[in-house]
Amino acid sequence: MDMNQYLDVFIDESKEHLQTCNEKLLLLEKDPTDLQLVHDIFRAAHTLKGMSATMGYTDLAHLTHLLENVLDAIRNGDMEVTSDWLDILFEALDHLETMVQSIIDGGDGKRDISEVSAKLDVNGAHAESAASAEPAEAQSSASDWEYDEFERTVIQEAEEQGFKRYEIKISLNENCMLKAVRVYMVFEKLNEVGEVAKTIPSAEVLETEDFGTDFQVCFLTHQSAEDIEQLINGVSEIEHVEVIQGAPLTSAEKPEESKQEDSPAAAVPAKQEKQKQPAKNDEQAKHSAGGSKTIRVNIDRLDSLMNLFEELVIDRGRLEQIAKELEHNELTETVERMTRISGDLQSIILNMRMVPVETVFNRFPRMIRQLQKELNKKIELSIIGAETELDRTVIDEIGDPLVHLIRNSIDHGIEAPETRLQKGKPESGKVVLKAYHSGNHVFIEVEDDGAGLNRKKILEKALERGVITEKEAETLEDNQIYELIFAPGFSTADQISDISGRGVGLDVVKNKLESLGGSVSVKSAEGQGSLFSIQLPLTLSIISVLLIKLEEETFAIPISSIIETAVIDRKDILQTHDREVIDFRGHIVPVVYLKEEFKIEDTRKDAEQLHIIVVKKGDKPTAFVVDSFIGQQEVVLKSLGDYLTNVFAISGATILGDGEVALIIDCNALII
């Protein structure tokens, strides 16, 4: 069998299982008595081990096997969760991630894991011996199912939630060449509709193919016996399937209480914890049993689909214009129907490309844990807006810039605990990672309450490196000085000690974000902290806009940025702090004249009434003054090309139905 056809699936699922292990281990560090977390990590490691063995990645399979032994020892009460032991587990995960990355890069996934294997063997030797003894015992009484305390607890709670327990006997064809592959395929099928609780022989024996043609599975599901049998028979080279529904496990069947007294008390809190959350577990169980159906699609195919749809939108706009000119009722109705249908199609296509930023954010708690240990600092990380969605192609690229900014916040921004106490700050530094939509952009902010940027030292270093001249230095405002840290001249190692707060390689961050069509800016208050703000395009090439007029020119404003449109009297505009504002629903909102911003001659200065559009960036509103509103329309966002990359407050252009080109306004650049 050619395993290359499964490689993409293996890589995607391996990354998901490793992420699960990382997240659950961080939670386990906070609550070492929660055995449900141990069980979740065990399941992820077990699945990864089976996949790795099937694909032939022996180092991956071996290391996850050792990981599994230790986790099994914990859930059986033979080991306790300690900080040192968690460090070893995290180290093992680092090796696993490196091996998976090697496979992604076209390598063989091999790595020297002797050192970490020795650490895991020391901690899990007794678990290994117990695991190795299990197959012989299981095979000697293959028809008698015996469950340990943890397995019994899991099964009983599943039965209380309405699950059925099936004991399934499966026979493979005598001529089956890849028994482990067939077993893996059976498990994949079963895991779509329930959960495999136990196997005879053990999973390790099944993976090494050290068994005959028969194996047994204890399976928990809502499905009927007939459905399960049909599901398994869908796998090739299955000779026979026998599905028997087991009688519910009762408390009378539990081992004697004396056994529980001999084992650590950690097993009891795990059960109590799970009883506290029946609704959550039940919801998860139903979701698992339901088996949501997904399909993996190459991103290039989605790009091609989007390109074709863009052409459809352009033609649709042209048809709308023709229907308007001809004033033909049937044509108008047909175009309106096509508009509605294509609008639904557009939403589906765009949503297919969108991924929540939590796929990137999830790596940072683990990174911060490691940095705390290395730097002897205490950090509290807050993540806000992880559900914010961004195009997949952008998501794949923003990880490294964010890692760089967060490392800078912790390494050079947050002070040591004793220094913070001397300054009257809490001992633990705070880092806030926030994401939110604004118009056709996503903003990601990294904020800390550390030392902030040292204005004087930044200026000194900028002059020393020749980034600016002394004459320029005299005229720079604070925010312009802070922006100097993104200059290439600052990306040298000695900047760590010379500039209080930031300075290493931030030009790389800026270049990367600009290559994605985004930007980065910084605000800081010395002694109070810094805020780095990343602006990224949603890369939604088809957007809904409001067309407006400025003199004879047509412009477009993204609907997603607009709060409201209105017509007001000129006398309603107030003057405060050298700025013009309006009272908008009880809030003071600054006024921006778009014709002034774009240097368009104003021939209507004496107009008594003004058309305004109230837009927002995050929670900041601003009122744009325009000449008139034309109407709402779906348009294709086009780049201005390489020659017009830095046009102020313009994010792109579009071709309207009548052939006119309209510039699309970047509201975020105009909001104060």
Curated annotation (Swiss-Prot):
First-listed, main subcellular location of the protein, grouped into a coarse class: membrane
Residue ranges with Basic and acidic residues bias: 253-262, 271-286
Gene Ontology, cellular component aspect: cytoplasm; membrane
Gene3D superfamilies named among the record's database cross-references: Histidine kinase CheA-like, homodimeric domain, Histidine kinase CheA-like, P2 response regulator-binding domain, Histidine kinase-like ATPase, C-terminal domain, HPT domain, SH3 Domains
Highest taxon above the source species: Bacteria
Residues making up the signal peptide according to the UniProt record: none
Modified residues (Phosphohistidine): 46
Catalytic activity: ATP + protein L-histidine = ADP + protein N-phospho-L-histidine
Cell membrane found in the keyword field: no
Sequence segments annotated as region (Disordered): 250-292
Keyword ATP-binding in record: yes
Domain CheW-like: 542-672
GO function term, MF aspect, one: ATP binding
Protein name per UniProt: Chemotaxis protein CheA
